[in-house]
A protein has these predicted regions:
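Structural preference for alpha-helix termini/caps and helix-kink/transition segments
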Residues: 90-287
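Alpha-helical recognition segments enriched in aromatics with Gly/Pro capping
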Residues: 1-145
Length: 287
């Protein structure tokens, strides 16, 4: 409880005229919206004392119950090696970055790429690198989805994706080590890329299911498209046939037709099929 100050809101209380302090504000908000015991309470490393200790003391005194089951205290974020500051011109909000055209999934990736107990140095260059990673994940997913429709491979092999998923789960269970889990995910995607041409239809379907499962964990929105539209596949078949007979004028028109539907053609290497990939939505500043 803070003593009243001039030109500030205040109320009468047994402790004199004043207002709630920010420690009690947080306890009150938690109890109102999350209940008397919070599953996970996060905050910056600078809030351990006195803020979080005060939250615990006053909340548990009021309810007689544990205030939070798990605490996650994150290191502070650096931008280009320095603390964020408006005066230095290195202060970014999420909306700022989105309005500059940066992929929201790339931003998400960068923020998840370092363990929360370690300091992250955020740079615009890291966003570009993260965008390339997201692009590789997208490409692999749509390669699998396309090949199921195109190749019809019945006698190929399968990958042990269950082992990778178990490793990822183990990393997440180790103090929420998302950075390690991401590294395992990327390694698995590289293995899928190596074996793509030799996977059976069942193996490809398992890869698609693996991506869907990883999307539920990491939220990169890779598998939001679960099926390639028939008209896109039909146009792709016409595109492939035009390329076979070296009718490049027609193939260019068909490529543009696919692009107008929000997809892009990915030409395969010699002996490999051409596939399609859904373009990501460009954030326009609206929800």
């Amino acid at each position: 409880w803070k003593a009243a100050k001039e030109n500030e809101p205040s109320w009468d209380s047994p402790w004199g005229k004043g207002r709630p302090g920010w420690h009690i504000e947080c306890s009150a908000m938690c109890m109102r919206h999350l209940g008397e015991t919070v599953d996970i309470h996060a905050g910056g490393e600078d809030l351990v004392f006195p803020h979080h200790e005060n939250e615990i003391a006053q909340s548990e005194a009021a309810t007689g119950k544990p205030f939070a089951r798990y605490w996650l205290h994150a290191r502070h974020l650096l931008v280009n090696g320095e603390k964020m500051s408006k005066s230095k011109g290195n202060f970014f909000t999420l909306r700022d970055l989105l309005q500059k055209g940066y992929d929201p999934m790339a931003i998400r990736y960068v923020l998840m790429s370092v363990h929360y107990r370690q300091q992250l140095n955020f740079t615009l260059e890291s966003l570009k690198e993260a965008r390339e990673v997201i692009e590789k994940l997208d490409n692999c997913y749509f390669q699998c989805l396309s090949r199921i429709r195109i190749a019809g491979q019945k006698n190929g092999g399968e990958l042990n994706l269950g082992a990778s998923a178990a490793e990822i789960g183990k990393a997440l269970g180790d103090d929420l080590n998302i950075a390690k889990a991401l590294a395992i995910f990327q390694k698995t995607v590289s293995e899928i890329n190596v074996h793509l041409a030799h996977l059976s239809e069942t193996g490809l379907s398992a890869c698609v299911e693996f991506f869907e499962r990883m999307d539920r964990i990491f939220g990169f929105d890779i598998s939001s498209v679960r099926e390639i539209p028939s008209d896109v596949m039909r146009t792709l078949s016409e595109y492939v046939e035009a390329r076979k007979v070296k009718d490049f004028a027609t193939s260019d028109q068909l490529r543009k037709a696919i692009a107008e539907k929000g997809w892009q053609v990915k030409d395969g290497r010699p002996g490999e099929p051409s596939t399609v990939k859904k373009n990501r939505r460009v954030w326009d500043g609206k929800k």
